[in-house]
Swiss-Prot record:
Pathway: Amino-acid biosynthesis; L-histidine biosynthesis; L-histidine from 5-phospho-alpha-D-ribose 1-diphosphate: step 6/9. Signal peptide: none annotated. Keywords: Amino-acid biosynthesis, Cytoplasm, Histidine biosynthesis, Lyase. InterPro entries: IGPD_sf, ImidazoleglycerolP_deHydtase, ImidazoleglycerP_deHydtase_CS, Ribosomal_Su5_D2-typ_SF. GO terms for cellular component: cytoplasm. One of its GO terms (molecular function) is imidazoleglycerol-phosphate dehydratase activity. This is Imidazoleglycerol-phosphate dehydratase. Coiled coil: none annotated. Belongs to the imidazoleglycerol-phosphate dehydratase family. PROSITE patterns: IGP_DEHYDRATASE_1, IGP_DEHYDRATASE_2.
Length: 195
């Protein structure tokens, strides 16, 4: 089982993330940011990753630090659970629709953090959630999971649907990229021999 637990405490947030990359999509998520909890649930369910996330942050200011730091801590946990990437498929991609919305997500566990983020949200907030924090979450995640991530919302006019298709597609692309290919044995999926 590829599992990891990360505890990250700062002056702004206190976060614990436990992951099982070979799970079934079970989750226990409490970040204090309800819309983020809903989106993290999509990652767990569609990625078949067991997630146990507890966060306490300075929500009296706003959700920025909490959302970003959950992304950072989740990225750290994914990187730790994946380990040296021996036998890893490395690449993953998914298209996910939800009614009128359609998003594409592509992942490379390259060891080189990079985010290409293309979502033109149709409104600034989804309930109380500032949609700008979606980018902050993924930027924190890719920086610490050491992945290249391309996110494209191809269409949609309902901002909730736009966000949900992105998180569902991320979960499905993650599931594909982090699978172990038994034909590779212990080989690292790079001509360099290291990622």
């Amino acid at each position: 089982m590829r599992t990891a637990e990360i505890i990250r405490n700062t002056n702004e947030t206190r976060i614990r993330v436990a992951v099982n990359l070979d799970g079934t999509g079970k989750q226990s998520i409490d970040t204090g940011v309800p819309f983020l909890d809903h989106m993290l649930d999509q990652i767990a369910r569609h990625g078949l990753v067991d997630l146990d996330i507890k966060a306490e942050g300075d929500l009296h200011i706003d959700a920025h630090h909490t959302v970003e730091d959950v992304g950072i801590t989740l990225g750290m946990a994914i990187a730790k659970a994946i380990g040296n990437k021996a036998g890893l498929r490395r690449y993953g991609h998914a298209y996910v629709p939800l009614d009128e919305a359609l998003s594409r997500v592509v992942i490379d566990f390259s060891g080189r953090p990079g985010l290409e983020y293309h979502i033109d949200f149709t409104r600034a907030r989804i309930g109380d959630f500032d949609v700008d924090l979606t980018r902050e979450f993924f930027q924190g995640l890719v920086n610490h999971a050491l992945m290249t991530l391309h996110i494209d919302n191809l269409r949609g006019f309902n901002a909730h649907h736009q966000a949900e298709t992105v998180f569902k597609a991320f979960g499905r692309a993650l599931r594909m990229a982090m699978e172990v290919d038994p034909r590779m044995g212990d080989a690292i999926p790079s001509t360099k021999g290291v990622l």
